[in-house]
Amino acid sequence: MLEAKSLRKATVPRSLLQHPSPGNVQSNRLALHVNDDNSSCWVYIASGCRIYKLEISMQDSLVNRGKESLLIPEQCEVMNSSLVNHCPHRSEIQSIALAETERSDCLILGSVDSYGHLIVSKLDNSGKDVDRLTFSALPRDCGVGEGGWAGICFSPSQWCMAAVARSFCKSIDVYDQDIHLQTIRTLWYPSSLCFMQTLCSGNDSSLLAVTEGCQLSIWDLRMKENGGCVHRICGSLGDIFYTVCSSSTNIAVGGADRTVTIYDPRRWSALSRWVHCSKYEITGLAFSSIDSDYVYVQGVDYEVLCGQWRDSKKVLSFRGDSNWLGFSKCANRDVLGGWCDSGSIFLADITKENYIQSTDGLSNGVPS
């Protein structure tokens, strides 16, 4: 079973950012990176046309619990904070994402604004800004027309490949660095996207999962027939999907129906439905990197919970103190971060509880 090692609450210094810009329902304006020695975590947040970073300690601490096992955060101070040396956008940043290169010696920071303008920078793995590489890419229509929500995701196997979704334009642009590869046209307004990490796609990361309206669509970037769309799954009519995530074996979606649905990509059938797990709409999902039978769920009502989706059982949860402006999970470990419009940042470190096996082969219930 998963348990919390620490839950910390820090406040963005007023000298760095006094009034954050409002966010969309999809909270994509936060990204995390834990330092190599696991002593601290860099939290990247986007407000307006700029990106800021804060360093928060990852020291283990006593975790207090309230009613219904709700985790109570420990107040802490921000160790370091600064403006990221990242080219500013001309309009409000809608989403940011972090990726690691093949050698893991540097980070790739990508951001997209409300008109679909993509900017990518290379940063040092320790969190320092290094002018190694910066490039930008404009959408095919050069960003004309009306702006709106936009999302970004990197390929898990090729950091140079990124997909940018634009809700108002009903389009998804795929880039290899600053080279435009193709444009996908969706039927409805896209709200979330991710490259699939499933066994059926291997390591080529050619499959892209997109939530659009009340549908989950799967796109194969290698195909031209039917625009590349290989499968569509319809949810309840009128219940919009807001988020999608993928593990090595399954894919999950959530949205206005407050239900997490897990699909098997080999047959595209529903394995499990965790009905009404959140009090309000689900706007963020992430599979646990420790055990993919667990999933993290972020709701509009400030709550973040972790549960076993097969048994529809909640194991832990915590709450923000106001609306989420950003929420994210580290790519390869269970560290969660959330940013509220009050200026508070919540950082949770989750681990798996180990049990010592007794001589008769049964667990004695004592943590190792």
PLM regions: where:
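Canonical WD40 repeat/beta-propeller blade segments in eukaryotic WD-repeat proteins
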Residues: N24-V34, P88-E100, R140-F154, T186-S201, ...
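Per-blade loop-tip surfaces of WD-repeat and WD-like beta-propellers in eukaryotic adaptors/scaffolds
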Residues: S57-N64, H117-A137, S167-S192, L199-S206, ...
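Structural hallmark of WD40 beta-propellers
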Residues: S39-Y44, R103-G110, Q158-V164, Q182, ...
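Beta-propeller domains
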Residues: M1-Q18, D37-C87, Y115-S136
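Alpha-solenoid helical-repeat scaffolds
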Residues: S91-R185
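Short, flexible beta-strand-to-coil junctions
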Residues: A46-R50, V112-G116, A165-F168, E212-G213, ...
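Terminal intrinsically disordered, low-complexity extensions flanking WD-repeat/beta-propeller proteins
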Residues: L2-A31, D36-W42, Q59, D301-V304, ...
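A common structural microfeature
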Residues: S27-R29, S40-W42, G48-I51, I93, ...
